[in-house]
Amino acid sequence: VTYPSYDNNELVNTFNNAYYNDLLQDGNTPLVNRPLKQKKASGSTFKMITALAGLETGTITPSTTIVDKGLFKDAGVPYARCWIYSNTGGTHGPVNVSHALEVSCNYFFYELGYRLGSTANGSDSNKAITTLNEYMAAFGLNDYTGVELDEYGPTMASPANKEKAVKTFNPDATTSQTRWTDGDTIRTAIGQSINSYTPAQITKYVS
């Protein structure tokens, strides 16, 4: 099932060329197979991966509490915002991982993504994204779904894919523009950054 819909009866038996041409010109692209050929950021569905990475690496425990301060400043400017701060100016206050998933607290997962890069000398954004990439791959977010239909492949947030994306728009981009940053990591941790998947890929991940 895909949306917007169209009348299949016009495209069988006596094929309606005029109707088909109208569909091709329709700005809503009704002929696009959206489950397999429309990619979007995974958004908050991704937070379960960040949670699992944090728990299995010992970065947090089920009882670890993080205080939502609204603006996450440790990754530099522009400061990342929790959705509730953007909408109301408020915060979720102290939350553990289960509560953070329940209320979809962005701040908790910014902090957790940042902590995944913790080292004796501070935060290492490459360490953090390497860990997240391992868990993304474990859930199949680095590969096609395997359905026997033509589909778009995933775009997994990673240093290599960031560099590729930046240079697509700016072939002369400098190293400072293409390098992976803490800001990229924390946005990846909530399913943003350059994460891009079809509905079918997200369905496979959560199934």
Model-inferred region functions:
Residues 1-44, 49-207:
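Beta-lactam-recognizing serine transpeptidase/beta-lactamase-like catalytic domain environment
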